[in-house]
Amino acid sequence: MGLNITGLIPKHMENRGKLTLKENLKIIENILEQRKAPENGIDEEHIKLLLRLLSFMDTDKDPNVVQIGEREARVYTKLQRDGVFDFCHGVGRSGNLIDPQPKAPGASVMYKLTNKLLESFLKALGLKVNAIATPVATGMSLALCLSAARKKYNSNVVIYPYAAHKSPIKATSFIGMRMRLVETVLDGDIVKVEVSDIEDAIRKEINENNNPVVLSTLTFFPPRKSDDIKEIAKICQDYDIPHIINGAYAIQNFYYIEKLKKALKYRIDAVVSSSDKNLFTPIGGGIIYTKDESFLKEISLTYPGRASANPIVNILISLLAIGTKDYLNLMKEQKECKKLLNELLEDLAKKKGEKVLNVENPISSCITTKKDPLDVAGKLYNLRVTGPRGVRRNDKFGTCYLKEYPYDYIVVNSAIGVKKEDIYKVIEKLDEVL
């Protein structure tokens, strides 16, 4: 950035000032040149500077522009501009979410940069995939994936290993596809879906001349166990049918990442994760990633119209602010907090004559309760504890089990961002109400 300040101040001061400016701009230049998530997070002032410089490239910032279109990024207040970081034109074009927008060169660069940083971030965690940030959350991102499967592979029925998650069910309904549920079975305390039952469902649909797509679940509340995505991916490869994975909070723990790495050797068309659950953004954005670049392109083509830049910018801000080094530290802290949660729950269970359920989940734990679990969860809420989930044994949706589950229970989470003091406090409150 050339600034002519010659003669305004002494030469030695001019040189010193230009050096400082150059070093500050170098941080921005490095982001644009390297196009990788930084190892160490960048401070907010430099992030704001980057966003401001990019937004100044959009045509609505041109002081001599003549605006005669029906969509010219006209907003009434500065408050509205601030809400989208001044990217009022949004992202994408009517035919493709990731296409550059002629009226918004800056927003187009911002979106492309976000996707590049997102791919490098996932690579730093061990996932060598293509990725896009989406302007919609998990459920609608799943709908985009299913819509793309319908368009590319003529899929007309979703094979869904049953999980009590409304988003995938509504996503399927939203795009007008039929869903075939595969029932869960009880294995000790765990609720799971047998891979053989999934294959049976696939075979039946194919025999009826249908084109199934499998929507498996990697992350969910216990006692529902993660689907065996590696074996499902093998089956989908054998039958040559698409496979979408709901991995809402898969990025935050290596337990899930390792499962993904193994499964990605076989048939996975797309994985969907949440930006708020993994990247500390406000709710509203999603992350879709896959090794199949052509299918990712197909997904972007299913989005109708332009989109708000807000969820995309929030993902970019998180990637820049956190940095890969601090994110790995946050993952480590999450694992330590989960270990502490398990230990304290075991002590509490012994004290109260309850049981910590033996479930395979690196994020959440379950403790039984002789009291009404909904009442317990309600009391925790009134004690200013948010997040615990009370489930009655006969709640077929809550337990993910279509028969009666053996226990009433409370689910307590230890997701990324939680602190040890939060764990101690929730156990203290649980002690009061159990």
From Swiss-Prot:
Record keywords: Protein biosynthesis, Pyridoxal phosphate, RNA-binding, Selenium, Transferase, tRNA-binding
Site (May act as a substrate filter by repelling compounds with a negatively charged alpha-carboxylate): E70
Catalytic activity of the protein: O-phospho-L-seryl-tRNA(Sec) + selenophosphate + H2O = L-selenocysteinyl-tRNA(Sec) + 2 phosphate
EC number: 2.9.1.2
Binding annotation for pyridoxal 5'-phosphate: R71
Pathway participation: Aminoacyl-tRNA biosynthesis; selenocysteinyl-tRNA(Sec) biosynthesis; selenocysteinyl-tRNA(Sec) from L-seryl-tRNA(Sec) (archaeal/eukaryal route): step 2/2
Annotated residues for binding of substrate: R93, S94, Q101, R306
Annotated GO biological process: conversion of seryl-tRNAsec to selenocys-tRNAsec; selenocysteine incorporation
Phenotype when changing K277A: Loss of activity
Entries under SUPFAM superfamilies matching the protein: PLP-dependent transferases (SSF53383)
UniProt modified residues of type N6-(pyridoxal phosphate)lysine: K277
Cofactor requirements of the protein: pyridoxal 5'-phosphate
Positions of region (Tetramerization): 1-40
Location of region: Phosphate loop (P-loop): 92-102
Keyword Protein biosynthesis: yes
InterPro entries: PyrdxlP-dep_Trfase, PyrdxlP-dep_Trfase_major, Sec-tRNA_Se_transferase, SepSecS/SepCysS
One Gene Ontology term of the molecular function aspect: O-phosphoseryl-tRNA(Sec) selenium transferase activity
NCBIfam families, per the entry: selenium_SpcS (TIGR03531)
Subunit structure: Homotetramer.
Similarity section: Belongs to the SepSecS family.
Function of the molecule: Converts O-phosphoseryl-tRNA(Sec) to selenocysteinyl-tRNA(Sec) required for selenoprotein biosynthesis.
Record-given protein name: O-phosphoseryl-tRNA(Sec) selenium transferase
Species this protein is from: Methanocaldococcus jannaschii (strain ATCC 43067 / DSM 2661 / JAL-1 / JCM 10045 / NBRC 100440)
Protein encoded by which gene: spcS
